[in-house]
Amino acid sequence: MAIRKYKPTTPGRRGSSVSDFAEITRSTPEKSLVRPLHGRGGRNAHGRITTRHKGGGHKRAYRLIDFRRNDKDGVPAKVAHIEYDPNRTARIALLHYADGEKRYIIAPKGLAQGAPVESGAGADIKPGNNLPLRNIPTGTTIHAVELRPGGGAKMARSAGSSIQLLGKEGTYATLRMPSGEIRRVDVRCRASIGEVGNAEQSNINWGKAGRMRWKGKRPTVRGVVMNPVDHPHGGGEGKTSGGRHPVSPWGKPEGRTRKNKASDKLIVRRRRTGKNKR
């Protein structure tokens, strides 16, 4: 993938850029693997906003992605097409299996049209192949990793992301996450080889607010420019600082803490935050 920059023909075009989509080999998705996707606009079943800054955007169809791949062990497949998916930053690859079935997977870097792909404990260590962690050599770069055996890929699925397999001891494998966090995962969990493609996605300059609206993202408004009825920081004559420690629109202190999860005990080292990111 490469980035194509626009000429500054308008203020919105100045500095903006777009993917050149050079790796895309097909413009329409496989009909049997597409489902309708209805926008919720950030509302729940009662019609109340539960997630702010969502709504609008271009109409999309959801592509069914195979995140498990455990029922196709030993069945060879070929990459028929590399396609665009509006629901994620990564590209997707359409696989044609030898038994006649078609499925989508996340397209890793280096996977091209016509490439062979397989899954199972005996699969080769090549981009796109899917194996249990116990069968992957230490030091291998992987993506689409499961948190629980059979639960489907949960980690490292976005464009350019990858996880490094640091080691294996007993029933656990040690992984270095994209955030820098080091955690342990059951060796029966499956992962795909290689890093996710479309790594230049993060370098795209969107250029104008309208392109964000096409993606279904609404404006984020600061509390200090609202009225007192809308936010605890609102109101005041002229420009103010809010007059209190930062809080949410509902008065809760900014920077909330999170409850402990059962899987937290498997974290060896926390992710880098604040000054530690350097």
Curated annotation (Swiss-Prot):
Pfam families on file: Ribosomal_L2, Ribosomal_L2_C
Disulfide bonds: none
InterPro entries, alphabetized: NA-bd_OB-fold, Rib_uL2_dom2, Ribosomal_uL2, Ribosomal_uL2_bac/org-type, Ribosomal_uL2_C, Ribosomal_uL2_CS, Ribosomal_uL2_dom3, Ribosomal_uL2_RNA-bd_dom
GO terms of biological process kind: cytoplasmic translation
Keywords: Ribonucleoprotein, Ribosomal protein, RNA-binding, rRNA-binding
Region (Disordered): 1-58, 225-278
Molecular function GO terms recorded: rRNA binding; structural constituent of ribosome; transferase activity
Basic residues bias locations: 37-58, 268-278
Extent of Basic and acidic residues compositional bias: 253-267
GO cellular component terms, A-Z: large ribosomal subunit
Family classification: Belongs to the universal ribosomal protein uL2 family.
Oligomer status and interactors: Part of the 50S ribosomal subunit. Forms a bridge to the 30S subunit in the 70S ribosome.
Described function: One of the primary rRNA binding proteins. Required for association of the 30S and 50S subunits to form the 70S ribosome, for tRNA binding and peptide bond formation. It has been suggested to have peptidyltransferase activity; this is somewhat controversial. Makes several contacts with the 16S rRNA in the 70S ribosome.
NCBIfam families, per the entry: rplB_bact
Stated name of the protein: Large ribosomal subunit protein uL2
Provenance organism: Rhodococcus jostii (strain RHA1)
